[in-house]
Amino acid sequence: MAGTSGLLNAVKPKIQTIDIQAAAGWGIAAAAGAIWVVQPFGWIKKTFIDPPPTEEK
């Protein structure tokens, strides 16, 4: 079974740097697309930027 070694290398190649870069790029694209679809800018502004309302008694 000398041919099985070559077959396994074709099925399970080593992970290359470009594969990691491509996965990161697709992740960024997916996150940007999700933010574009949801557009939570009002919630982000209300939650993180505007000061909390003060209670006056």
From Swiss-Prot:
Record keyword Repressor present: no
Keywords associated with the record: Membrane, Mitochondrion, Mitochondrion inner membrane, Transmembrane, Transmembrane helix
Membrane topology designation: Single-pass membrane protein
Ranges of the Mitochondrial intermembrane topological domain: 45-57
Domain of life: Eukaryota
Mitochondrial matrix-side positions: 1-23
Transmembrane regions: 24-44
Gene Ontology CC: one annotated term: cytosol
Location(s) in or outside the cell: Mitochondrion inner membrane
Family, as annotated: Belongs to the UQCR11/QCR10 family.
Task performed by this protein: Component of the ubiquinol-cytochrome c oxidoreductase, a multisubunit transmembrane complex that is part of the mitochondrial electron transport chain which drives oxidative phosphorylation.
Self-association and partners: Component of the ubiquinol-cytochrome c oxidoreductase (cytochrome b-c1 complex, complex III, CIII), a multisubunit enzyme composed of 10 subunits. The complex is composed of 3 respiratory subunits cytochrome b (MT-CYB), cytochrome c1 (CYC1-1 or CYC1-2) and Rieske protein (UCR1-1 or UCR1-2), 2 core protein subunits MPPalpha1 (or MPPalpha2) and MPPB, and 5 low-molecular weight protein subunits QCR7-1 (or QCR7-2), UCRQ-1 (or UCRQ-2), QCR9, UCRY and probably QCR6-1 (or QCR6-2).
Protein name as it appears in the record: Cytochrome b-c1 complex subunit 10, mitochondrial
Origin species: Arabidopsis thaliana (Mouse-ear cress)
Lineage, opening ranks: Eukaryota, Viridiplantae, Streptophyta, Embryophyta, Tracheophyta
Gene coding for it: UCRY
